Amino acid sequence: MSLHRVPRGWPASRRAAAAAIEAGLTNAGFPNKLHRSMSRPVIEYEDVVRPEWIDSNGHMNLAYYVVVFDFATDALYRALDIGDAYREASGNSCFTAETHTLYEREVHLGDRLQVRTWLLGADTKRLHYFHEMFHAESGERSAVQELMALHIDMGIRRVAPYPPEQYAALQQAVKAYAPATLPNGAGRRIALPNR
């Protein structure tokens, strides 16, 4: 099992939790499910706010929203067959080139989270997708993250085209899982209002 996204300095308990998530285990003390269906969105990833994610303000620290979105990205890559197994078999991977995270509502210790992921587009070298994090019980949206990933040839560690069969599969996935309209928050930029 690869823990390539887990920082070396993380304590053993946090590394174990990440390993359980990556392995898709459901007996790790919190739910972790990957649903694949032909209905939109492409995946739904679930998690629970853990004690080590709570900051001095009594809510989940902003960094852990990104961690949950990263776990959802791993689930997305597995669902699209561009995850760890793809990297090992092809020598290719995906690197995140750009993200934009918008925090909308607090979440607290023990809150169940659901992340829905939408495919916004793909070309020969890029994948554009959008995560929405919801409070599972209330249904309120808590945060969103928009991402652009680049396809990388790991042998030279440079951007490279997807192999033709993978590119075709991604195009089919985008057709199947693209939202009818852009989700609220997609395409935003950070700027001060004009005066």
Q: Each predicted region: which residue ranges?
A:
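Terminal targeting signals and extreme-terminal segments of soluble enzymes
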Residues: 13, 21-114, 120-195
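Compositionally biased low-complexity segments, especially N-terminal hydrophobic helices
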Residues: 6, 17-22
